[in-house]
Regions:
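Short, C-terminally biased terminal segments at protein or domain edges
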Residues: 1-117
Length: 117
């Protein structure tokens, strides 16, 4: 997968997270949970985007690794919201599948980049 595919998919994921969080805020879901999900869900794409201007391969890898950590955190908050009946099973699985796809792409990219060092 190319970096542009990662950028596109991570931005789409962030938008879906934002749409979900708007709904959750309207339902008066715990603000801390909603804010954490927005923060980490949008940070994935922000770090991938920022990597385009990395100062070198190590910096590029670092940005992707941060995106990977944010992806893992995002999945945690989705699980918590699902397990507390704040989001539907359908919504959870849709976003979780997107998150897993991003994580796989990031892991693959980081492994490839580390081999090039």
């Amino acid at each position: 997968m190319t970096e542009s595919v990662l950028r596109t998919k991570s931005k789409e994921y962030a938008k879906n997270i934002i749409f979900l969080c708007r709904e959750l805020k309207a339902k008066h879901t715990e603000a801390t949970l909603v804010n954490q999900l927005i923060r980490c869900g949008s940070s994935i794409g922000a770090n991938i985007h920022e990597a385009r201007y990395a100062q070198g391969t190590k910096d590029f890898i670092s940005k992707f690794e941060i995106a990977l950590k944010e992806c893992n955190e995002s999945e945690y908050w989705l699980e918590l919201l699902y397990e507390t009946n704040c989001i539907s099973e359908e919504e959870f699985h849709k976003l979780q599948n997107n998150c897993v796809e991003l994580r796989r792409m990031l892991v693959s990219s980081v492994k490839t980049l580390k081999k090039q060092l």
